[in-house]
Every structure is written in C-alpha cells, then in structure tokens.
From Swiss-Prot:
Residues 173-200, 293-438, 511-639, 653-756 are annotated as: Disordered. Residues 746-756 have a biased composition (Basic residues). Residues 654-665 have a biased composition (Low complexity). Residues 417-427 have a biased composition (Basic and acidic residues). This is NUT family member 2F. It comes from Homo sapiens. Belongs to the NUT family. InterPro entries: NUT, NUT_N.
Length: 756
C-alpha cells in the first residue's frame, strides 16, 4: 500500500491478550530523519489472539516526529494507527479484520511529498485523536489502494508466515473521503462515534507543546520570513491547528495554515500577549536544552564530541546555530547552571560600576576549567573586558572642578608642579599683579594713548601716592596710605579739597623755601598776614609807574581792589604751592616736553601791547588795559577756585594749562601783583618814589624785548612761583639763570625792611 515516508512504530510496550489461537500482524516503524535516503528497518511481527480486543499502549521509547521536507507527522506521540490482520483459524475465507487503536496526540500529516518509489501522494489529511477504547467488531478498514497480495508501488514485502496473511496498513495520507471498500461499510465513523469528547479537550503537557512549537517554527518562518512574531505565531498555531483538526479532519495543512494566518491577523495585540509570553518560555526551554547539550559535550571533552542530541531528548530538533542566537535576549532562569555553562554572569560588569582598580574574578575561571572549555569560550573574556582605571584627564577635570568649588588652589594643597603639568591643566601665570594677556595689555596701551583718559586717571590719583611713586627713593607706607584713604571716604568734596590744599601748601612751600630762600607760605593766619603786609608795603616799580601816570583810573577801580586781592591770592596760592612740589627731578622727567598748546592768556592784560606797557605807549592805554583787566577779574572768583582745585590733582601739567599763566601774570600787565597791589598802595598812601633797588631794575625790564623780561619781580611771597612759571613756560633756562641773582638781592632788602 502507499505510504508517505513515515511509519508507525511498535515498541516493546505492545500489550496483547494471550489466547489459544493467535493472530499475526506486521507493522512498519517510523523512519528517523536522516540527511541521506532513509534506510527502512525490518518488519516487526506480533502475535495477538483471534477473538480478544487488541489494545496497543503508547510508545514509551521513541515518539513520532516530523519527517524530512515537510513529510511525515508533525505532532508528538502516537495517533490512531489502523492495522488490518487475518486469523489463521479455519480455511481461507473472507478476511476478518480487527482494528488496533493507539491513543496519544493527534497525528498531523504535512504537505504532499514523494514516495520512496517516486510516486506522488495525495494531499495530506489531519486526523483527530481517539480514545483508547477496545474495538471488538469485525470492522474492516480498507482503502482503494489496498490489496491482499502485499505492499503496492514497489515496496518490498518479506515473505509472511505460512499460516498468516498480512493486510497492508491504511495510509492516512489520502485526503479524499474514506470509500466503502470490499470489506464492508468501513469508515472513520465507528472509532469517532465511540470516542469521548471530554478526553480530546484535555490539555497537553508542556513538553508536547514545546515540541509542536519547534516543528511549527519552520512553517511560521515560511509565512513570515522576516518578522519578529515567528515564535509567537508558532505558539498560536498549536491550538488553532488542533481545533481545525477536530472540526474538519479532512482539511489539508495548507488550508489550516491559511485560516490560522487570517485569525492571527485579526487578533489584537492584547490577545497576542499570551502567545508572546508562551514563546518566551519556549525560548528559555530551548536555551536550557542547548546549554545541557553543551555541558554534556564539555564533560566528555573536546576530543570526542557526542552527537548533537542527548539520549533522553528527541533526536529531531532545530539545528544548533538557530538555538545559539536565542539566548541573546532571553537569558535562562533555571538557577546557577546557566551562567556557568553558556551565559556570561553579571559579576564581571561590577568592577566598572564600582571601582576600576579592583580585578574582576572572571579571569580565574579559565584556569580552573581549562580542559572543559568549548572553542568559543576563550573569546568571552575579551567581550566582557572593562577598563582597569579611569583616564587621568577625567580625574584631573574632577579635581579642578572640586578645587574651584571649594575655593582652594593647587599650590595650597601642596601638589607638586610636575603633577599639575602632567594633568595638562594650564593656569594663568600672574607676576606682580600683571597678567600676561596680550589683549589686555594692548587695550591698556590704547587707553594710555588717549589724553582724556590720562587726564581723568591723573585727576583721581592720590597726590601722596603719586609723589612717593615718582620719588627717586620710594619708601611708601601702604598701610598708612590705606588708612588715610579710608578716612577720606567719609569727607565731603569741600573738606577733601581743603585738606589736600593745606597738605600740599605745607609740603610744597617747605621744599621751595630752602631752595630759593623765600618766605614760607603757611596756613597760619599770622604768617599769611605778614606776607600780605610785606607785599603792600613794598610795591613794585611797575605799580608806581601805573599809579603816577593814571591816578584817576586806578582810583576808579578802588572798590574792586579787595576782590582783586582775594582773587589774586587765590590764583597765586595754588600755582605757588603746586610749583613748589615740582622740585623733584622725577616730576620734571615725567613732565611733557611739548610746547604749550595755548599761550593766549585768559586775561586780556597778558601778552597785549597795552598790558605789557612797552615804551612809547601813552598812559591812557596802560590805564585802559588795567581797567579792562580788573573788570574781567571780578567775574572769575568762583572759577579760579575750581580750576585751582583741578590743577592740584595734576601738578605736572601746569605748564600746558593757561590757568597758571593767568594767575601768575596780572591783568594789568605789570607782573603777578601789579594789578593787585596798585589799589592797595593808593589806599594806604604809599610814597610814589621807588626804592633804589627797584629803580636800578627799571631800565633792564623795559629795555628787554622778550615778554618774560618785561615782567617785574613779584612780591616776597609769590616771587618763587612767578619765576618758575616764566622759566618753564615762557623763557629759556639761560634767561632764568640771568635774572636769578637780582630777585634774591631784592628779597633780602625787603626782608630787612619788614624786620625794621
């Protein structure tokens, strides 16, 4: 009879009922899958009684497995196998058939294939499971291809025993309805009618479902080649195909798969989660099975590797490379066996998480199990290798951040310089408070080149600090200076100006008096009054000339005399004090050598023909110039104070400013005190006759062509500042040296006159 390449197996667990007369039947075992052509095992002969029921137990040794190339049963366990036999009692008569029922999982015959002889089989048939009920009726199960003579289609049949004639096994590969054969009204109805439906709904064991899942995976991959749902779909096929086989046993496998795929597409994701979880468990089983196989190989040694299937497991299964890929995302949950066998333990990752310098315990294991390691084992230490230490750049960056947060510097912690350089930490080097930033230095140079900026900076520099800084022997007491600056912070602007004015007058006049032999201008009212009396009693020769030539004009200016005296004193005090502070050679070196920007005096009496009183001019012009200068002088008392306080803050720029020259030269053109002392001389009724020393000086002053020589000698208290301003701003050094002896002689005479 025709067969599709797989045969039922009768193992040693066949149960027979003893009797007087025995029947003989022959069965063919299932052929195990092999890469080459299958070798057909020999036939097995069993003796059964002729009248009793024949019940064959389940196959305990080798379960039914799927055949190669989609042929053979794809379910685990045995199914309904119908065996025909004849008894040997009596003469030859129509055969008396008995049915043997084997009860286990349903047998699913797969896609069509070829016979051993090359003849195509009909489409497969899905058979339902049947309970183990003994069949006693003489039911004959036959087929259209059955014959009494033996196996058809070229299958060799060994010679039967002389007293028995074996009927062929009916192949379940016929998808057509079971026809009514020559042996009666046979069909599947008797066996299905006596089956209990409750037994068919019993849940199968997990192991059987796992084997079915392994067999369904190739079918699922064929329909979903590149989908991650292959394992879940294989789990979905287990109950669906089982239900379809119960509902319609004549349905082919292709039809069942098509309906199962349609059901899978209409299933929601929530309902699919059950099959995903089942697939996860099956993948874990597969991984554990593979690890057990590898463990058994390691125990036997790498020299003699056993066959890939263990003795207790089914030989037919997925290849090893397929299973190796599965444990990557589904690790085993069966205790400590899995990490030691295949999966890497999580312990080698702990050194990277906690401390890098701790050696991982993993490298010690290859030495202990060196003889049992598989070939891919030596590559795993390289995969789980972790860095032994943290990079020094990261450590140094962390140290820098912590030092910056804590406010400490590398030098404070005692860290050597070499370690800081090794950590590649560059810090700006500062020497004496000067940064080496080229951009900052260029910006400072640019600011210093601006005259307005320099002027503003000079205005805020403390004079004491500047004096000590520019002195040849700087001995500055920074503590005293800081205390003084703190005291000055609480003063108002007027108090601050007055304090600096008094200090500058004391220091400046103290330095100018021993050099030029002049009377010191103190802040005490007695000395200041004595200086004023000396100036009033000894008028200048030019003042006498102006008084004699134009008494009405000078008398007319008499009410303004007192104001002019105050203004002249205020204008003369500041330059005298500040010019006295210019004696140090450092200040002269700092003083710019450029010529004065504006020699035009603020008062019209300076530098004009009327004010200078050149020979040949009428007295009216002189008096007119005096009157004009005195009228403008009344408008300046407030401005002189402001300008004087401004110039106290920048003493070395007096030669460029027009204010000192306006303060030193009177508006009347007669010298610094010419316009100031002429009204006071008229008030007090001074004698118009000049002293002999003054008369002797009269001609050279009027005869010299330069304006500096036309200026008369000032009074005793202001003559030093007048000479210095003329020597710096208007005349050369030779002219100041030429007149140096004459003022000293006149001062001595005036001092003697005051003492008398």
């Amino acid at each position: 009879m025709a067969s599709n390449g797989a045969y039922p197996v009768l193992g040693p667990g066949v149960t027979v009922n003893p009797g007087t007369s025995l029947s003989v039947f022959t069965a063919l075992p299932f052929a195990t899958p092999a890469p080459g052509p299958a070798h057909r095992p020999p036939l097995v002969t069993a003796v059964v009684p002729p009248a009793g029921p024949l019940v064959l137990s389940a196959f305990p040794s080798t379960p039914l497995v799927a055949g190669q190339d989609g042929r053979g049963p794809s379910g685990a366990g045995a199914s309904n196998v119908f065996v025909q036999m004849r008894t040997e009692v009596g003469p030859v008569k129509p055969p008396q058939a008995q049915t043997l029922i084997l009860t286990q999982a349903p047998l699913v015959w797969q896609a069509p294939g070829t016979l051993c002889g090359g003849v195509m089989c009909p489409p497969p048939l899905l058979l339902a499971a049947a309970p183990g009920v003994p069949v006693t009726s003489a039911q004959v199960v036959g087929g259209t291809q059955a014959c009494e003579g033996g196996w058809s289609h070229g299958l060799p049949l060994p010679p039967p025993p002389p007293a028995a004639q074996v009927a062929p096994i009916v192949s379940p590969g016929n998808a057509r309805p079971w026809p009514q054969g020559a042996h009666g009204e046979g069909s599947l109805a008797p066996s299905q009618a006596k089956a209990r439906p409750d037994d068919s709904c019993k849940p199968k064991s997990v192991y059987e479902n796992f084997r079915l899942w392994q067999h369904y995976k190739p079918l699922a991959r064929r329909h979903l080649p590149q989908s991650p749902d292959t394992e879940a779909l294989s789990c979905f096929l287990i109950p669906v195909l089982r239900s379809l086989a119960r509902r319609k046993p004549t349905m082919t496998l292709e039809e069942g798969l098509w309906q199962a795929m349609r059901e899978w597409q209409h299933t929601s994701n929530f309902d699919r989660m059950i099959f995903y979880e089942m697939a996860e468990k099956f993948l874990e089983f597969e991984a554990e099975e593979e690890m057990q196989i590898q463990k058994s190989q390691w125990m036997k040694g790498p020299q003699s590797l056993p066959p890939p299937a263990p003795p207790r497991l089914e030989p037919r299964g997925p290849p090893a490379p397929e299973v190796v890929k599965q444990p990557v995302y589904l690790p085993s949950k069966d205790g400590p066996k899995a990490p030691t066998a295949c999966l890497p333990p999580p312990r080698p990752q702990r050194p990277a998480e906690t401390k890098a310098h701790l050696p991982p315990p993993r490298p010690q294991r290859p030495a202990e199990t060196n003889a049992h390691l598989p070939p891919p084992r030596p590559q795993r230490p390289a995969e789980t290798k972790v860095p032994e230490e943290i990079p020094p750049e990261v450590v140094q960056e962390y140290v820098d951040i912590m030092e910056e947060l804590l406010g400490s510097h590398p030098g404070d912690t005692g860290e050597p310089e070499g370690q800081r350089e090794k950590g590649k930490v560059e810090q700006p080097q500062e020497e004496d408070g000067i940064t080496s930033d080229p951009g900052l230095l260029s910006y400072i140079d640019k600011l210093c080149s601006q005259e307005d900026f320099v002027t503003k900076v000079e205005a805020v520099i403390h004079p004491r600090f500047l004096e000590e800084l520019l002195s040849p022997d700087p001995q500055m007491d920074f503590l005293a200076l800081s205390q003084e600056l703190e005291q000055e912070e609480g003063l108002t602007l007027a108090q601050l100006v007055e304090k600096r004015l008094l200090s500058l007058k004391e220091k400046g006049c103290g330095r100018a008096a021993p050099r030029h032999g002049t009377a010191r201008l103190d802040s005490s009212p007695s000395e200041f009054a004595a200086g004023q009396e000396a100036a009033r009693e000894v008028p200048d020769p030019q003042q006498r000339v102006s008084v004699e030539t134009s008494p009405p004009q000078t008398a007319a200016q008499d009410p303004q005399g007192q104001g002019r005296v105050r203004t002249g004193m205020a204008r003369s005090e500041d330059p005298a004090v500040l010019l006295g502070c210019q004696d140090s050679p450092r200040l002269k070196a700092v003083r710019p050598t450029s010529p004065p920007q504006d020699h035009r005096p603020t008062c019209p009496g300076l530098g004009t023909k009327d004010a200078l009183g050149l020979p040949g001019e009428s007295p009216v012009k002189e008096s007119h110039g005096l009157a004009k200068g005195s009228s403008e002088e009344t408008e300046l008392p407030g401005m002189v104070y402001v300008v004087g306080s401004h110039h106290r803050l920048r003493p070395w720029r007096l030669s460029q400013s027009p204010v000192p020259s306006s303060g030193l030269l009177s508006p009347g053109g007669r010298g610094p005190q010419g316009a100031l002392q002429s009204p006071s001389a008229q008030k007090r009724g001074l004698s118009p006759s000049p002293s002999p020393a003054s008369k002797s000086k009269k001609r050279p002053l009027f005869g010299s062509p330069s304006p500096a020589e036309k200026t008369p000698h000032p009074g005793p208290g202001l003559r030093v500042s007048g000479e210095q301003s003329l020597a710096w701003g208007l005349g050369g050094p030779s002219q100041s040296q030429k007149r140096k002896g004459d003022p000293l002689a006149s001062r001595r005479k005036k001092k003697r006159h005051c003492s008398q």
